[in-house]
């Protein structure tokens, strides 16, 4: 009887400890955001970006550009933070004028500590906005 109880207790202990071990998973988040014509104030040759120049239709200037960068970076910095403190691993972005505006965006205080690297493809959009920018976290 004592041997039976010892074996039974050992089996019970093994089964309890094997079920109580939590599986660990790596969690990644992917987000997408339309930056709605994120243009800088500098004309790019071959692009129809004239309405986003200081003398253009939108009277686009450094103050407006910096405000848009700040607002967009604050919004992007809040994506997925309910699950991941540093936000999404990958953020797809559309309506980005060029790589330079992505670099400016990622230098903003709200995003600068995230460790994002840029994958950008310059394409033939008639408005001067190619729809693909992809910051990817190296963390």
Region roles according to the model:
Residues 18-113, 119-132:
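N-terminal, active-site-proximal structural segment of metallo-dependent hydrolase catalytic domains
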Residues 131-139:
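A well-ordered secondary-structure block
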């Amino acid at each position: 009887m004592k041997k039976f109880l010892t074996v039974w207790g050992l089996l019970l202990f093994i089964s309890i400890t094997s079920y109580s071990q939590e599986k660990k998973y790596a969690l990644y988040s992917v987000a997408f955001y339309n930056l709605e014509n994120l243009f800088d104030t500098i004309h790019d040759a071959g692009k129809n970006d004239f309405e986003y120049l200081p003398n253009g239709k939108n009277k686009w200037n450094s103050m407006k550009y910096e405000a848009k960068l700040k607002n967009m970076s604050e919004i992007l910095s809040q994506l997925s933070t309910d699950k991941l403190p540093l936000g999404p691993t990958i953020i797809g972005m559309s309506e980005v004028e060029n790589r330079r505006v992505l670099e400016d965006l990622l230098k903003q205080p709200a995003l600068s500590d995230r460790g994002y690297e840029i994958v950008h493809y310059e394409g033939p959009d008639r408005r001067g906005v190619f729809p693909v920018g992809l910051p990817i976290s190296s963390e």
